[in-house]
UniProtKB/Swiss-Prot annotation:
Domain of life: Bacteria
InterPro entries named among the record's database cross-references: PPIase_dom_sf, PPIase_FKBP_dom, Trig_fac, Trigger_fac_C, Trigger_fac_C_sf, Trigger_fac_ribosome-bd_bac, Trigger_fac_ribosome-bd_sf, Trigger_fact/SurA_dom_sf
Keywords of the record: Cell cycle, Cell division, Chaperone, Cytoplasm, Isomerase, Rotamase
Native organism taxonomy: Bacteria, Bacillati, Bacillota, Bacilli, Lactobacillales
Chain ranges of the PPIase FKBP-type domain: 163-248
Gene3D superfamilies assigned to the protein according to its UniProt record, in alphabetical order: 3.10.50.40, Trigger factor ribosome-binding domain (3.30.70.1050), Trigger factor, C-terminal domain (1.10.3120.10)
Single GO term (MF): protein folding chaperone
Keyword Cell division: yes
Name this polypeptide is given: Trigger factor
Organism for this UniProt entry: Streptococcus thermophilus (strain ATCC BAA-250 / LMG 18311)
């Protein structure tokens, strides 16, 4: 195989490669055997036309597309490997010369991985705003949140206050005309929860059971139902009941209700403190890792990041997110409906920092290469076992999905991150 590379711009070039007759002829034979099965030619049984008759009647070039499709992927990969190129996007293939009895010549416009010149990545001094210390106030706040979760709603006679729940019937109208979705009966609404559009809940504060209130609001300009966006509406609202939260007493009985492994409130507080300390330790380590990686990227020099790499990262991140949702039984349609967003909104969210993620990955890869990191068979098997447990899959399934090279790459990346973060010093 003849192979050459012409650099056309930063991280871009054209690969020219030839495919020899030793690969072409078997591919033509395979293409002929595939095509002739469905041929009906007068004078011959279906699928039994001789090769010479086929060439005379249709021409050998009728086989070229199938033959080229069969041998192109391997030929292209061999050309890239021979040149030692690290291609980061789908190539644009063009056939330059193809014909009977000659080698076929093709070109591939490729985008290559940018060069990374590492700066300092060890013993970095970083600042983080996350504290590992757990205060008494934080323990009390967690306890109070858990206590509120056990609160019961008790019907009250007085006026509704923020935090109370009102049970209401309502009918909404715009310019005196009722609209779809604007009606409800016996709907429970916690005042101050922000469940309804801005201004609605505020106008029910002070209402009592049996009151009828005309709630006047304006739909937000970005309201999901575009036919209502920006319009003024009136909701005739009847208050059926007002309920207040009644929280249990802060005592040992509460502690036992919240956690059957403790007997006293002090024991529960001690347990909550340990849980908060563990969570803060993780948050602190994550913050140090993020700060150290950011600084390592800042210290490095990356020669012009190809737009294709950023676009690939957006697609990868979105597909990973959607895959995680589907593993939880949530379809994309369901997610967008629940969140009131669109696929384009999600795309913009991932576009916002995709450039940074690509640069970070490039620097981590460069560190792994500089440190000569590899992975042993034992490390690869452990990675497979860990992934199988994380995603509730069979070990064999993970082995089929991920090649040893992919796993080696991931393990080397983890080692590189560990080198960067473990040596970092917090100011």
């Amino acid at each position: 195989m003849s192979v050459s590379f012409e650099n056309t711009a930063t991280n871009r070039g054209v690969v020219t490669f030839t495919i020899g007759q030793d690969k072409i002829q078997p591919a033509l034979d395979q293409a002929f055997n595939k095509i002739k099965k469905n041929l009906n030619v007068p004078g011959f049984r279906k699928g039994h036309i001789p090769r010479a008759v086929f060439n005379q009647k249709f021409g050998e070039e009728a086989l070229y597309d199938d033959a080229l499709n069969a041998i192109l992927p391997a030929a292209y990969e061999a050309a890239i490997a021979e040149l030692g190129l690290d291609v980061v996007a789908q190539p644009k293939i063009d056939v330059k010369s193809i014909g009977k009895g000659q080698d076929w010549t093709l070109t591939a416009e490729v985008v290559t991985k940018p060069e990374v010149k590492l700066g300092a990545y060890k013993d970095l001094e970083v600042s983080v705003e996350v504290s590992k210390e757990v205060t008494d106030e934080e323990v009390d706040a967690k306890l109070e949140n858990e206590r509120k979760n056990l609160a019961e709603l008790i019907v009250k006679d007085g006026a509704a206050e923020y935090g109370d729940t009102v049970v209401i019937d309502f009918v909404g109208s715009v310019d005196g005309v009722e609209f779809d979705g604007g009606k409800g009966e016996n709907h429970s609404l916690e005042l101050g929860s922000g469940q309804f559009i801005p201004g609605f809940e505020d106008q029910l504060v002070g209402a009592k059971s049996g009151d009828e209130v005309e709630v006047k609001v304006t739909f937000p300009e970005d309201y999901q139902a575009t036919d209502l966006a920006g319009k003024a509406a009136v909701f005739v609202t009847k208050v059926n009941e007002v309920k207040a939260k009644e929280v249990p007493a802060l005592d040992d009985e509460l502690a036992k209700d919240l956690d059957d492994e403790v007997d006293t409130l002090d024991e529960l507080k001690a347990k909550y403190r340990k849980e908060l300390e563990a969570a803060k330790e993780i948050a602190f380590d994550d913050a140090v890792e993020g700060a150290a990686l950011d600084l390592a990227v800042e210290n490095a020099e990356i020669v012009e990041l190809p737009a294709e790499m950023v676009e690939n990262e957006v697609h990868r991140a979105m597909n990973e997110f959607m895959g995680n949702l589907q593993r939880q039984g949530i379809s994309p349609e369901m997610y967008f409906q629940i969140t009131g967003t669109t696929q384009e909104d999600l795309r913009k969210q991932y576009e916002a920092d995709s450039d940074k993620r690509v640069k970070t990955n490039l620097v981590i890869e460069a560190v792994a290469a500089a440190e000569g990191f590899d992975a042993t068979d034992e490390e690869i098997q452990k990675e497979i076992n860990d992934l199988a447990a994380e995603y509730n899959m069979e070990v064999s399934q993970v082995s089929e999905l991920l090649s040893p090279e992919m796993l080696k790459h991931d393990i080397a990346m983890k080692k590189a991150v560990e080198v960067i973060t473990s040596s970092a010093k917090v100011k």
